[in-house]
């Protein structure tokens, strides 16, 4: 996204991608209304929605057999009043294809960033490993978009603030039938929580487990794992037998952390490279998109004039740190409360507080705004009249209320110049 936006502004951009393609399973597959609004502002929405996807207009959960609607996106002040469920590789292929229409955009596949190039104390490029050897790519600015294990932030010795997370997630696929609920997302029972994301022909499923307990679970055997899934979601029935090997089940070690400082002279980190998020709410990819929009808005002109100082890079962190901190604080709190579910291995009943919270009129709209729009959603520079932006800012005050409501509910149960981005 950032490569597209900078190339669109006239900046020469080289994107380095480690792999030969974008195909990776169990990556973030949710495209939230805030991101879809960015696509609209860029004039890409119609083409984007032609890609295969599912639309999630409401979010429903089941707690111990009690079904409740947790969020309703149908009233959001956006052009798309839903979350689009789409494989991330399709999203990346789409953006890459559109970005290639700009003469200044260059994506180099199978280029893995392994080191940073320094000139007189300033980062001036990237050393990449390629199928034919190493390659040095010079740049006026290196932007690390290479995720939570980013080589850019490691080599630059950027200090990381870690937040303890008591859960991990086991991702797997299980087939889906036409009789399965379309809008159901979360299932809580028997001391476990199971997320089911509708991918049309199958569910992308995630079982939340105590952090570090995966090996213990493996030792108990695959049949025990299948039994757990059956207990939480009985309607899956014999489909759990599709899980025949532990290789079908992928462990995500959940992290929540952020950089104390996102930049060095010649380097900026954004997205997961600057702040690793948990999968809760599927907000990670969308927070990264918001980072990209803010970065392009703030740095396109300085890149064109060649005036990208540390103070200019600091503007990006100043703009995006507040949404990051708020979102992470809420995720940490939510996970700590959700971890309490593990303390009750038997059949569970929905607490009255859960029923009371989601019985309050309008709560589902507020949680939808919190999840779908987030804190301080970004807009393409010049895309909206200032009056609309002001109105949107006023409306966004409700986000805090919505997030708080969601957390309460949970507690109850990154002249032409050159830039280089790594991903």
What is each model feature region?
Residues 193, 254-259, 274-286, 322, ...:
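Glycine-rich phosphate/pyrophosphate-binding beta-alpha loops
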Residues 5-27:
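Glycine-rich FAD pyrophosphate-binding loop
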Residues 15-16, 144, 270:
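Generic enzyme active-site microenvironment
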Residues 100-114:
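A conserved beta-strand/loop element that lines the FAD pocket in flavoprotein oxidoreductases
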Residues 32-100, 117-120:
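Active-site-adjacent segment of FAD-dependent monooxygenases/related oxidoreductases
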Residues 114, 121-136, 141-254, 258-263:
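Conserved FAD-binding catalytic core of PHBH/FMO-like flavoproteins
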Residues 297-423:
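C-terminal helical "tail/cap" subdomain of flavin- and related membrane-associated enzymes
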Residues 252-269, 325-326, 343:
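FAD-binding beta-loop-beta segment adjacent to the flavin cofactor pocket
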